[in-house]
Amino acid sequence: SLERNDFIEGLNLSDAGTLLEKFKKNNLARLELQSNVHLEFPYLDILSLSIRGELGWISDNKVDSFFHFYCGGMTGIKGYSFYSIQGTKKLFLDFTIRAPVFSGKHYKIGWMTFQNSTLGLINQLGDAWDPNKFLLKKSVGIQLRINGFSFYNFPTAIELEYHQPITKFNNKGIEYGPGKNRNNSKTYFKILFDF
C-alpha cells in the first residue's frame, strides 16, 4: 500500500496564543505478506503442525517509529515485549506442534462445558529491523487450549501460553532476553469465541 501521512511532530504557539500543530510528512510504501499452513504428521494422526509466516517491508527507513513493524508480544515473538522488536523490515516464523488432550467430551464446570483440548509446543523466530541491524530472535513456548461452550450456547475458547526468550539483545539501552538475575518469561491468557 502507498501511504501519505502527515504525522504530528510537535506544537507551536500562534500570535494569538493558541496551540498550532506542527506536522511532518511520513509518506511511504508498505508491503506485507502472510501465510498459514496446517499439516498432519504421517502415521501420527494425533499430531498436527501449524506454520505461520510473515514478511514486511517499508520503503522509507527514516520514517517515524510510529509506522514501524513491531514483532514482539502477543502478535509476534511472544517471548519478548511488543515494543522491544521494531523496524522497517520484518521476518516472522511460528512453528507449533499440537496434540489433543481430550476430544469430543462434555466436561461440565459450572456454566461451562468443555469439549476439546490441545497441548502445543511453539518455536518462534524472526526480527523487525532497520537496514544492516538484522539479528534473528528466538523464543520457545508451551500452549494449552480448551474449547467448548458457556451458558449453553456461547462458543468459548480459552488459551494459556508460556514463552521463554532465547536470544539476548539490546534495543535503545534496554536489554531483552534471558538474564542471570531476572525471569523474562511471558505468560498470555485469552478468552475468545474461537481460536
Language-model segments: residues:
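C-terminal transmembrane beta-barrel domains of outer membrane proteins
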Residues: 1-195
